């Protein structure tokens, strides 16, 4: 192939129509560096084929993978779970699946708003209740969908910016893989500004499987 790397790769993917694209992704010390000019990021923005981003981290030596599945209640999350069901053998016989969903820090957000405009304060208990409701909404369809394909997942509630929280958890818990659904983008800018998947791909140390 001759030409701009990202454009040529996306063009070849469209012509060949593979079931999966595997790409190496260099680790970055600064998220902005990945967002600015990354071939990997441009391919994520330009193709609708599942993409596996592989890091320098060695492949797991055992069959018992720890797999995090990031969900947000959308159809894209269900598509990722559907892909897992169709390709279950790729994860091995002893894989441990965790459903990850991040909710905003409702209490901190309300305290900031209250300080700005003298609004009534909200108790931590009320904030906790709201966050749990958001979490249950995000996982309501994902958990039964996983159970339907023979997976009994553990649900993990995270708090904070979704991309940051998921990547932070994956790194802290040393997950072997994170799987997530993502909608396509019509241009690179929208991917940079709007994609949780892009954020996770930038910050997580483990491989990331992104399903369209």
Features from the language model and the residues they span:
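General small-molecule cofactor/ligand-binding pocket signal
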Residues: 1, 52, 98-100, 154-158, ...
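Structural beta-alpha unit
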Residues: 1-21, 144-178
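A short acidic, glycine-rich active-site loop
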Residues: 120-134
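Short, structured interface segments
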Residues: 40-58
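Small/aliphatic-rich secondary-structure junction motif
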Residues: 64-122, 144-151
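Short beta-strand elements of ligand-binding domains
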Residues: 24, 51-56, 210-212
């Amino acid at each position: 192939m001759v030409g701009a790397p990202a454009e040529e790769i996306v063009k070849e993917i469209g012509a060949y129509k593979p079931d999966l694209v595997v790409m190496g992704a260099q680790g970055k010390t600064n998220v902005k560096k990945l967002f600015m000019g990354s071939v990997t990021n441009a391919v994520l923005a330009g193709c609708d084929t599942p993409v596996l981003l592989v890091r320098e981290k060695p492949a797991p030596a055992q069959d018992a993978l720890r797999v995090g599945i990031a969900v947000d209640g959308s159809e894209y999350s269900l598509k990722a779970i559907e892909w897992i069901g169709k390709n279950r053998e790729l994860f091995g016989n002893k894989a441990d699946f965790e459903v990850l969903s991040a909710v905003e820090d409702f209490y901190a957000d309300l305290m900031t708003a209250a300080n700005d405009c003298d609004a009534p304060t909200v108790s931590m208990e009320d904030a906790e209740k709201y966050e749990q409701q958001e979490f249950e909404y995000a996982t309501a369809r994902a958990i039964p969908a996983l159970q339907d394909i023979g997976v009994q997942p553990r649900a993990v509630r995270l708090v904070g910016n979704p991309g940051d929280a998921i990547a932070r958890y994956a790194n802290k818990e040393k997950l072997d893989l994170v799987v997530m659904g993502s909608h396509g983008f019509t241009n690179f800018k929208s991917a940079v500004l709007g994609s949780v998947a892009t954020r996770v791909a930038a910050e997580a140390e483990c491989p990331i499987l992104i399903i369209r």
